[in-house]
Amino acid sequence: MTVVLDSRKDFTLENLRRVSVTGESVLISPGAKKAIKRSRQSFMAYLDSDRTQFIYGTTSEAGQGASKRISPEQQRQLARSRSRVRPGGGFGLEYVPERVVRMIIFARLANYIEGNAKARPIEAQRIASMLDRPLPKLPLSGQVGAGEILPLAHVMNFLPEGETEEGEWMARINGSPVSSALLCDVALTARGHLSLATQIFALSVDAYAAPLTPYSASLVRYARNPHEKRALRNLRWWFKTSSHHGRIAHQAPVSWRILPAVLGAVEEAVAIAEETASISLSSVTDNPVYILPTQSEPLGRAISTGGYHNAQAAPAIDDINARFADLCTLADRHTMKLHSADHLPANLADPKGDGWGTGLLSFLQ
């Protein structure tokens, strides 16, 4: 199957999953091609109206040479000379997973689909076609440049050959689709990991014969935090067939009773990551970005921005890592308690059997 892109509304986590995990192709819709073409025409009219105005990387050089204006002929020469993107720096033996490279390519198209990349339709089609070709290897380490130019240079080095015109080469390597893709990769997997963790901790509650009262329905009504409510409901789902009989008469250890609170914190981190990923994926992050024509600005406008920096992605990923580390700590405490509880057999072995239970694990520590 093929994901059809008509506008930025089509840049969803589900479509990203189809492209990156299932390996589907991308098709630029006829309507989107027309919109991109109209935008390109209006940008060129804007550029030709005053070739001395500042448009980063178009009427000026890039990087440290941004203050140097160049003549119209030099502007055309600069565009032609950058038709082939040179690979960025990097070192080490590890590479970004191929699914994430596909995510980067998909996310890159968000700037193009409605014309904000100020490029011709052929440029968007070239990028989309990369998903049907051998993928570049993107080094995991050594990307120490400003913004995301270095990793994007690695990816865009694999673009099909073709000349670039004014304003197009910078659109290939500026913006922040890499951080967006990395965050989306976390967002696509985090909820599944949380669901598995919830199931495992519910099993631990039953294995320890802990009371079910800390997970009662009445607590769902009292909880003010919506994420804790959801965590509690998800945990309770696994106790639908659990019996209240045969459980310890006193309260369970702390690491069992705080499960709703800790799982609720993970729920919140996952929800934030999903929301932030969805926003990042469908955002325009080019630099310079082309503002489409309006009644007050009939030719549109090119503006230098900080679109190459996604300030939300790293904190969202860090929070996910921190919350899952909390679950690892809880799992460690549960494991210790399950092997030291007076009401459970040593090494969790069947007293009537001749097995070792988990005794062999002690040799692996």
Where are these regions (language model features)?
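FAD-binding core of FAD-dependent oxidoreductases
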Residues: 54-114, 137-182, 313
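Short beta-alpha connecting loops at secondary-structure transitions
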Residues: 181, 217-221, 301-305, 345-356
